[in-house]
């Protein structure tokens, strides 16, 4: 049996408001649970696929700076 994690995550948050999405992200990060990481990855994939080149560059700069801390 195969489980489509990406599809499950997207189905779970599809139609959510910005506030609901923020709550989902904050809860996942604050919980610190490893099992939440794939879901955050799926959400990041959506952000990345919908970002223009300037937004991608800004995200990469933010990531690079965050990893230097």
From Swiss-Prot:
InterPro entries on file: SspI
Localization per Swiss-Prot or TrEMBL: Spore core
Major site of localization recorded for this protein: other
GO biological process, one term: sporulation resulting in formation of a cellular spore
Pfam families, per database record: SSPI (PF14098)
Keywords: Sporulation
Recorded superkingdom: Bacteria
Induction text: Expressed only in the forespore compartment of sporulating cells.
Family classification: Belongs to the SspI family.
Record's protein name: Small, acid-soluble spore protein I
Organism: Bacillus cereus (strain ATCC 14579 / DSM 31 / CCUG 7414 / JCM 2152 / NBRC 15305 / NCIMB 9373 / NCTC 2599 / NRRL B-3711)
Gene (UniProt): sspI
